[in-house]
A protein has these predicted regions:
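Non-heme di-metal
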Residues: 1-251
């Protein structure tokens, strides 16, 4: 049986790595925003951060909550509907559930710091274009699914997050915003797992359909260029009020 052939019995798993390396590892890494103390971050925000640093952090956090909702929908709606294997569906639902934890956590950070204009993210050109690129790819046949999954796993769960993570983590290196820094560590762990397993699933598709890789190559490379351009615009938006103490937009 192949990845797209339905299996009614729960077991035996045909693709057990999606249980052991996907579902189980994510389940073992469970966390909630309530575990993160934020009193120090509030004090840093009110007393130590400059206006440009606050603008930088705000530009990042407002976008994160909305983006995580779209990523959750991708796992729980698209991936689950494409692959009728319990082990893959369970992994996808677990990943989607974890993305809701990220969304709640970022919303909690926003509200704690007084950043609650969530709709502003959707109307700001640089961030809106980046957001649209994450959810624009559809798939209704193996080739379309392969293109969508490769682009999503490599860029939505990979490239699109890490410049912002690096910026936020830079504050922890200055002994600032430690609560946000802790959340970044946990989020990076989760997103790295999601990207890894999504890419693994795409490669599995290519093993079962050797023509798929060649057929997807052009669109994936085009998406890479699009995401790079969108990410550069997003970085310019983050640093619109200038560089910060230990980090420059160029970096």
């Amino acid at each position: 049986m192949g990845l797209f052939e339905e299996r009614i019995p729960y077991k035996p798993f045909e693709y057990p790595e999606y249980y052991t390396e996907g579902w189980l590892k994510q389940a073992q890494a469970f966390w909630l925003h309530t575990e993160i103390p934020m009193s120090g971050d509030v004090k840093d925000w009110n007393e130590k951060l400059t206006a440009s640093e606050k603008n930088l952090v705000g530009n990042i956090l407002l976008g994160f909550a909305q983006t995580e909702c779209a990523v959750s929908d991708y796992w729980t709606q698209k991936v689950v509907s494409w692959f009728p294997k319990h082990e893959i569906q369970q992994m996808a639902m677990m990943f989607g559930s974890q993305e809701t934890i990220h969304a709640v956590a970022y919303s909690y950070l926003n509200e704690t710091l007084g950043l609650e204009n969530f709709e502003a993210f959707l109307h700001e050109p640089a961030t809106a274009e980046r957001f649209d690129n994450l959810v624009a790819y559809e798939g209704n046949n193996p080739e379309g699914i392969g293109k969508s999954l490769a682009i999503f796993s490599a860029f939505a769960e990979g490239v699109s997050l890490y410049s912002a993570f690096a910026v936020l983590y830079s504050f922890q290196l200055r002994n600032l915003l430690k609560g946000i820094g802790q959340q970044m560590k946990w989020s990076v762990r989760d997103e790295s797992l999601h990207s890894k397993m999504g890419c693994h699933l795409f490669r599995h598709m290519c093993e079962e359909n050797p023509k798929l890789l060649k057929n997807c190559e052009k669109d994936v490379l085009k998406a890479a260029d699009t995401m790079l351009s969108a990410e550069e615009q997003y970085i310019d938006k983050m640093f619109e009020q200038g560089d910060i103490e230990n980090l420059k937009a160029y970096d």
